[in-house]
């Protein structure tokens, strides 16, 4: 009986030793400089049915691209999702979240260069963009590779 247990244990140990190797994890972070979103501001009309975002996308590898991005809604455009909008080589979309409670809302953009298969997700709090002020300092984001 003891020899049977030993043989079974040896077989289990041998089978795990020869199992197929697990592939290494692959980083999806791109080997390019961070992208800087420059001079971003949001201006909403008095009825909050339209908000215009203006900003630049600077990859530090080409001339910066200026973007004007308008989000329209029947109400609360400052909290509405928007896009897609094309700005030069980029496709821009956005979504607002209030997940952290009252007065802690924020908007996250997806800035995608499909030709280079790169994306960044810049995010700005409602406080940063209130009353049409320009966000300062500019914020930079590490691009990720699209699969």
UniProtKB/Swiss-Prot annotation:
Induction: Induced during growth on maize and banana roots. Disulfide bonds join 44-51, 67-87. One of its GO terms (cellular component) is extracellular region. It is found in: Secreted. Transmembrane segments: none annotated. The keyword Disulfide bond applies. Keywords: Disulfide bond, Secreted, Signal. Residues 1-19 form the signal peptide. GO terms for biological process: effector-mediated perturbation of host innate immune response by symbiont. The keyword Cell inner membrane does not apply. Its main location: secreted. Stimulates salicylic acid signaling in host plant roots. Homodimer. This is Effector TSP1. The lineage of its organism: Eukaryota, Fungi, Dikarya, Ascomycota, Pezizomycotina.
């Amino acid at each position: 009986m003891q020899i049977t247990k030993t043989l079974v244990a040896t077989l289990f140990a041998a089978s795990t030793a020869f199992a197929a190797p697990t592939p290494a994890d692959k980083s999806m972070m791109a080997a390019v400089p961070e992208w800087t979103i420059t001079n971003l501001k949001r201006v909403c009309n008095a009825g909050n049915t339209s908000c215009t975002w203006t900003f630049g996308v600077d990859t530090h590898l080409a001339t910066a691209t200026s973007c004007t991005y308008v989000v329209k809604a029947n109400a609360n455009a400052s909290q509405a999702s928007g896009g897609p909008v094309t700005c030069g080589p980029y496709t821009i979309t956005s979504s607002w979240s209030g997940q952290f409670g009252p007065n802690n809302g924020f908007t996250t953009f997806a800035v995608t260069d499909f030709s280079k298969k790169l994306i960044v997700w810049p995010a700005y709090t409602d406080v940063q963009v209130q009353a049409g002020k320009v966000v300062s300092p500019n914020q930079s984001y590490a691009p990720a590779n699209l699969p």
